[in-house]
Structure formats: C-alpha cells, structure tokens
Amino acid sequence: MPLLTTGKSFIRALEKSGALGVYVPLEGGFEGRYQRRLRANGYTPYNLTARGLGDLSSYLTGIHGVRPPHLGKKNIGQDAAVGPVYFVPPIATYQLETLPPKSKGLVLWIIEGMILSRAEIEYLTYLPQQEPRLKIVVEMGGERYFRWQPLEQSIQAA
C-alpha cells in the first residue's frame, strides 16, 4: 500500500458499480482518508451504522413510523399501550433533496455491514440503479489493507 493514495481508482470503481463492499484495517483511519477523497471529488458522504436499521427500504427511501421508548410514562386511555408513533422522513431521500447544487451525489457509508442479511445487501446493491445520484459503501469486514470490490461480488463471497 503506498503511503499516499489519491483514491482515484476507488472513486472510479464506486462510480462504475454504484455500490462497493470495503474491507478495512481494524485499527481504523483508512476509511476517513477515503471519505476525504470522496468529499474532495464532489460527493457528500453520510455515515451510519447497520445496527438497528430495521427495514432498509423504509428507513432509507420511505416515511416510516418510530415508537420511542416510553421510559415508564404512559398516557392511560389516550394512546396505544405501546406508545405514540412518530413519523420520520427517509434518510437517503431527505439527504438527496438537500444536497448542494454542485454536488455529484450522496455516498452512504455504512459501517458494521457484516451483520446485514443477504437480502438487505442485495437491496443495497440495486438501490443506486433506482437513484443514480446515490452511491453505497458498506464495510463488510476487516483486512490487513484497505481493499474494495463491487457489492455483488461481496454477496457471492458470503
């Protein structure tokens, strides 16, 4: 691995496939460098973790209901026994709508992607085809050096 990387091959691979599975060193640091390269090339990165995402299609592209913890305080007879429902805007769609005018697109950088199921990874693979300004990077595990491959190949390897 060279000391200084420009990240051009990473960005070309991301633009070509739309969704990448990356394997990063466990000590960290490399993903920040590549996110900085993305930002310098006109993309807007957005970090989120795969833990607790729930239904990816509704969380990323559809308005979905959330029931926050009630912390022992309930309204008796006025609301449902499980608490009120708050409707949250979709993360990816909302971020795409608020992109700066000169931005090339949005890059969803999902950490801890190894816990996602095969169906969820397949959904993430086809999401950039539905919305061309959206790119996906999923951290699929650890490696001794920073490497990437199209997310379709990560599905086949799993």
UniProtKB/Swiss-Prot annotation:
One of its GO terms (cellular component) is plasma membrane-derived thylakoid membrane. Keywords: Membrane, NAD, NADP, Plastoquinone, Quinone, Thylakoid, Translocase, Transport. It catalyses: a plastoquinone + NADH + (n+1) H(+)(in) = a plastoquinol + NAD(+) + n H(+)(out); a plastoquinone + NADPH + (n+1) H(+)(in) = a plastoquinol + NADP(+) + n H(+)(out). Pfam families: NdhN (PF11909). The keyword Transport applies. Its main location: membrane. Its EC number is 7.1.1.-. Coiled coil: none annotated. The keyword S-adenosyl-L-methionine does not apply. It is a peripheral membrane protein. It comes from the Bacteria. This is NAD(P)H-quinone oxidoreductase subunit N. The lineage of its organism: Bacteria, Bacillati, Cyanobacteriota, Cyanophyceae, Oscillatoriophycideae.
